[in-house]
């Protein structure tokens, strides 16, 4: 589920910043590929017990997420605050969420 403005996805009641929609499909896919490679590298480093490689792979994950717009400075320019990782019912989206079918699925 995305917020009406498309800035966040909601997973288990928590807001997670969505990727920057201004990225081209090609840019976005290249960054997602880099992110997934970095995540696999984190797992491989952990399994190998290689703390140096794990730290480097985690830095690659962070860089990819910043480039996607999911971390770092917000990608919108209207001055709205970043509500990443907030519970949706504790955010400015609470009224919308409570009135939506997603908040109270029957």
Residue ranges of predicted features:
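Extended, charge-rich alpha-helical interface modules
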Residues: 1-106
């Amino acid at each position: 589920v995305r917020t009406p403005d498309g800035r966040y996805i909601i997973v288990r009641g928590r807001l997670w910043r969505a990727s920057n929609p201004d990225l081209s499909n090609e840019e976005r896919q290249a960054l997602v590929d880099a992110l997934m490679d970095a995540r696999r590298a984190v797992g491989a480093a952990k399994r190998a017990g290689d703390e140096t490689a794990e730290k480097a792979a985690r830095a690659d994950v962070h860089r990819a997420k910043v480039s996607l717009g999911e971390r770092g400075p917000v990608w919108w320019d209207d001055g709205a605050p970043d509500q990443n990782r907030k519970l949706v019912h504790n955010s400015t989206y609470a009224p919308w969420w409570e009135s939506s079918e997603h908040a109270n699925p029957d």
